[in-house]
């Protein structure tokens, strides 16, 4: 008889350790323990130039949003440091000068150290109460019995309503986008809409990255179940130095906190020059649960205030342990804050997960992260025996692994979360008039090995103000931006400079440079040459009025009528010089004022030409 025992292995694999079961609704994953998870990508403001008061206000607003959560709720916040997109591909620069400028910048960018940027994600998990507790609550509270959804449907609807409330509360602090699914088509050559349709899931893609360190699209099955096997299909080697697939894992734990917190206290981690995932987990507790835990600590410290003799005989002659007295007061103060509803307490766990194919490089990077944490005043250690459990606890939706028991309140949590970020700019130019997915205007650099993708546009508006001291390089910067603008197809630049600051670039790039009113310039204008339409005629009337005002004349309704009549007559003439226009004016005072701009005056060589000198 054939023995099949060796083929029926009961050993635990990676999918068995994951808590992901199915997707009951759009953007929601249900865990094996019955929990529900929803995730967002978010980004805080770049507060590099903000004051301490502004940062404190930001933390307070986030705390106000978090105190709405209680027992059964858990939040995972991940700050993912990853390599930035490389320099844009070759663009159709129309001349050698601007092409060489961009080529030199490309070489410089590629020769610099690694360029990284941060992506921020948040997962909100809710574990419903046990069925027995729900049934008891149904006995206590009476009301209309109209349960057509069942317990699972009620829990799901309540969770979705809670998500909307949470999004509304946190929208004033963080700009977020829910992780959802998108529909795609395989497509055929020449027929992109033909072929089989499939669904890509952003949330599962994010979960897969947290597990394997690989950022790849994840297709959602037609029956969205057994998600643990879908995204946990890599071999896991446990031990002191765990490994998932080809990537070795190092977990750096924050196991000691400073005496006080301040907003953005871990912001320096956002500038490290290595890839990592900084995970913060917070398991919320209701007020009565937190007070029960605190009361145990209060009793312990009360017993330490006086010696055994004083406690037995109930005397107060012995020395008082001032440290125990202070600790008791701290606990009682925390209990009063819980009672007031200003803060919520919970279990906080923070880890930085580093993955790399080379274990030697991984150890160097882990030591670099540990050193950065120690310099911030925190305690840090590289996990060994506890590495696998710490890594599992950092995965979104996992609540049972690596729970740190000391309580922390939500205001401390707000100070330690990555709610501020270094702004790296839009990945593509946001102007709708450029081709789709056009690169940013230029690549520059900001703090912490982070590139800055500079685009002057916000939507279709590109208004920009540049301030700086005299000789600080403003004109050079403007000329550089003009040169970079030629990366877009059919680009044109019209520039007004001062002191010939744009002369070199204009001539080197094959442009036309006009020295208006210069000593050797022959450029002259014919401002009234295009007054064939009503819009141009209206503009001409306003422009002539401006010339009169500059000469100190007062514009009356009669003057305005005379100007309009003259413009009308000039529009039927083949000669549209200012001299011809002045001859159409019937008012002597107006003719005298306008002669200043004709060949009879000092500006006639500039404004009284028969045709525009611009090419």
Regions found by a protein language model. Name each.
Residues 1-421:
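Extended, folded cores of ATP/NTP-driven motor/assembly subunits in large transport
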Residues 52-68, 292-296, 390-452, 503-510, ...:
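P-loop NTPase motor domains
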Residues 352, 449, 497:
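Conserved hydrophobic/aromatic pocket- or pore-lining residues that grip, position, or stack substrates
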Residues 458, 470:
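The conserved Walker
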Residues 461:
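Short coil/loop residues immediately preceding or within conserved phosphate-binding loops
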Residues 466:
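Hydrophobic anchor at the beta1->P-loop junction of P-loop NTPases
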């Amino acid at each position: 008889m054939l023995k099949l025992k060796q083929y029926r292995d009961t050993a635990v694999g990676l999918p068995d350790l994951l808590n992901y079961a199915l997707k009951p609704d759009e953007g929601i994953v249900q865990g094996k323990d019955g929990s529900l998870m929803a995730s967002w990508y978010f980004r805080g403001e770049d507060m590099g130039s903000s004051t301490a008061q502004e940062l404190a206000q930001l933390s307070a607003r986030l705390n106000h949003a978090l105190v709405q959560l209680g027992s059964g709720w858990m939040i995972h916040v991940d700050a993912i440091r990853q390599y930035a997109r490389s320099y844009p591909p070759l663009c159709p620069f129309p001349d050698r000068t601007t092409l060489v400028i961009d080529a030199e910048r490309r070489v410089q960018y590629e020769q610099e150290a690694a360029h990284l940027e941060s992506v921020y994600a948040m997962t909100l998990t809710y574990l419903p109460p046990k069925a027995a507790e729900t049934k008891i609550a149904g006995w206590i509270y009476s009301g209309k019995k109209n349960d057509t959804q069942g317990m699972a449907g009620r829990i799901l609807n309540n969770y979705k309503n809670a998500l909307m409330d949470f999004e509304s509360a946190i929208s004033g602090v963080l700009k977020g986008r829910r992780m959802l699914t998108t529909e795609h088509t395989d497509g055929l050559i020449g027929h992109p809409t033909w072929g089989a349709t499939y669904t890509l899931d952003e949330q599962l893609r994010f979960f897969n990255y947290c597990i394997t360190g690989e950022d790849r699209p994840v297709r959602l099955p037609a029956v969205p179940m057994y998600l643990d096997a879908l995204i946990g299909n890599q071999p896991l080697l446990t031990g002191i130095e765990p490994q998932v697939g080809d990537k070795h894992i190092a977990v750096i734990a924050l196991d000691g906190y400073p005496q006080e917190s301040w907003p953005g206290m871990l912001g320096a981690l956002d500038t490290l020059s290595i890839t990592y995932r900084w995970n913060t987990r917070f398991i919320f507790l209701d007020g009565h649960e937190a007070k029960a835990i605190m009361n145990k600590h209060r009793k312990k410290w009360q017993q330490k205030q006086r010696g055994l003799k004083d406690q037995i005989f109930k005397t107060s002659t012995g020395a008082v342990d001032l440290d125990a007295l202070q600790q008791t007061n701290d606990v009682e103060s925390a209990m009063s804050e819980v009672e007031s509803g200003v803060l919520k307490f919970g279990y906080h766990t923070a880890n930085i997960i580093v993955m790399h194919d080379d274990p030697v490089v991984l150890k160097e990077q882990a030591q670099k992260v540990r050193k950065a944490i120690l310099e911030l005043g925190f305690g840090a250690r590289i996990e060994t025996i506890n590495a696998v459990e710490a890594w599992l606890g950092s995965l979104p939706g996992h609540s049972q692994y690596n729970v740190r028991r000391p309580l922390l309140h939500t205001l401390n949590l707000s100070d330690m979360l990555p709610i501020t970020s270094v702004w790296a700019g839009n990945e593509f130019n946001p102007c709708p008039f450029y081709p789709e997915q056009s690169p940013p205007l230029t690549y520059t650099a900001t703090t912490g090995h982070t590139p800055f993708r500079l685009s002057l546009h916000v939507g279709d508006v590109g208004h920009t103000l540049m301030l700086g001291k005299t000789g600080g390089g403003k004109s050079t910067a403007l000329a550089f931006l003009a040169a970079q603008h030629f990366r877009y197809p059919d680009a044109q630049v019209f520039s007004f400079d001062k002191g010939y600051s744009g002369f070199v670039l204009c001539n080197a790039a094959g442009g036309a440079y006009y020295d208006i009113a210069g000593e050797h310039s022959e450029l002259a204008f014919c401002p009234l040459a295009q007054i064939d339409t009503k819009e141009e005629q209206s503009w001409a009337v306003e422009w002539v009025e401006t010339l009169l005002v500059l000469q100190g004349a007062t514009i009356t309704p009669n003057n305005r009528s005379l100007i309009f009549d003259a413009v009308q007559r000039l529009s039927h003439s083949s000669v549209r010089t200012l001299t011809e226009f002045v001859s159409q004016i019937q008012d002597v005072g107006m003719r005298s004022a306008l002669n200043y701009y004709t060949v009879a005056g000092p500006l006639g060589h500039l404004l009284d030409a028969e045709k525009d000198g611009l090419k």
